[in-house]
């Protein structure tokens, strides 16, 4: 994969989080974000993904 999805995989692996269900969940988040950014050149994918993850209880330790 190229683009944001590939970046997510790298970030997840670098954090030592290799759980497949988590990877799938993050891919789903990325796909939603990619759909939302269509037609908008100013959409900040990474900032929005961080905002999504920031508000997920399972990611509290990332703070």
Curated annotation (Swiss-Prot):
Q: Which reaction does it catalyse?
A: 4 hydroquinone + O2 = 4 benzosemiquinone + 2 H2O
Superkingdom of the organism of origin: Eukaryota
Q: Keywords assigned by UniProt?
A: Copper, Lignin degradation, Metal-binding, Oxidoreductase, Secreted
Thermal dependence: Optimum temperature is 55 degrees Celsius. Half-life at 70 degrees Celsius is 30 minutes.
Molecular-function annotations in GO: hydroquinone:oxygen oxidoreductase activity; metal ion binding
Q: Where in the cell is it found?
A: Secreted
The cofactor note reads: Binds 4 Cu cations per monomer.
A Gene Ontology annotation in the biological process aspect, one of them, is: lignin catabolic process
Q: What is its EC number?
A: 1.10.3.2
What this protein needs as a cofactor is: Cu cation
- Induction notes from the record: By copper ions.
List the record's Gene Ontology CC terms alphabetically: extracellular region
**UniProt note: pH dependence:** Optimum pH is 4.4 with 2,6-dimethoxyphenol as substrate, and less than 2.7 with ABTS as substrate.
Enzyme class, UniProt record, top EC level: oxidoreductase
Q: How is its activity regulated?
A: Inhibited by sodium azide.
Q: Describe its function.
A: Lignin degradation and detoxification of lignin-derived products. Oxidation of a broad range of substrates including mono-, di- and polyphenols, aromatic amines and methoxy-substituted phenols accompanied by reduction of oxygen to water.
**Oligomeric state and partners?**
Monomer.
Q: What else is known?
A: On the 2D-gel the determined pI of this protein is: 4.05, its MW is: 75 kDa.
- In which family does this protein belong, per the annotation? Belongs to the multicopper oxidase family.
Please state what the protein is called. Laccase-C1
Question: Could you tell me which species this protein originates from?
Answer: Cerrena unicolor (Canker rot fungus)
Question: Which lineage ranks, top first, belong to the organism behind this chain?
Answer: Eukaryota, Fungi, Dikarya, Basidiomycota, Agaricomycotina
């Amino acid at each position: 994969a190229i683009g944001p999805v590939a970046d997510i995989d790298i970030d997840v692996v670098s954090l030592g989080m290799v759980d497949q269900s988590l990877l799938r969940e993050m891919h789903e988040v990325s796909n939603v974000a990619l759909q939302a950014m269509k037609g908008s050149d100013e959409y900040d994918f990474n900032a929005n993904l961080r905002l999504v993850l920031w508000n997920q209880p399972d990611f509290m330790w990332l703070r």
